Amino acid sequence: NSGGGLGDSIQLFSLILSLQNHFKTTEFFYLGAHENHFEGKLKEYNINIKTLNLGLKYFGFRWWHILFAKKRFLNKDSDKIDLVIDLQSKLRNTIILNKIPHDHFYSATFGFKFCTKKKEYLSNDHLENLSSFLNINIRKIKFNLRNLHEKYKSEAKRLLPDKNYIGFSLTQGNIYRKKNWSIDNFITLANKISEKNKRPVFFIEKKEIEL
């Protein structure tokens, strides 16, 4: 389970690949507050993970979901999940997610109090904590750029041929929220970065005409 923003999904690359590499015969599902970006904007990265769609918009962000999470899951002719991995940090989201039938539950929320296995989780790295949780050593797998289609790498080299770039995302990866920062703040910071011989780059979707 993840918040569902584009940035949230990108940060999951290594975790998903590592778990899929270790548990090769296991079926993985993604449950987020919004669309599964691995089947949409990030599909070119070829990270395959199925969507668990409970039909609850903004899943975990509405208290009334607590009344329907279990029922919607059972209506999918599913019994329970072997392991639920909660990557949120809000108490509300975790409580709602915990309603889905499961054998084991991993969550960093509230000092890991919701974990079904009580241990000392000392790392900020979920993969390290999951290795401890499962009593196994899960090898970390990073995304390999060689897995990207050559046309995307060629386009990246065309747009960014040099080095020392620092990227700014001017829009919110979560389409239901707005950036707290104004465009003026981004420009001010970009100017300061330029003074340090870095090259600011602004990531803007074509549809963002005003920007």
Please tell me what each predicted stretch does:
Residues 1-211:
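Catalytic machinery of carbohydrate-active enzymes
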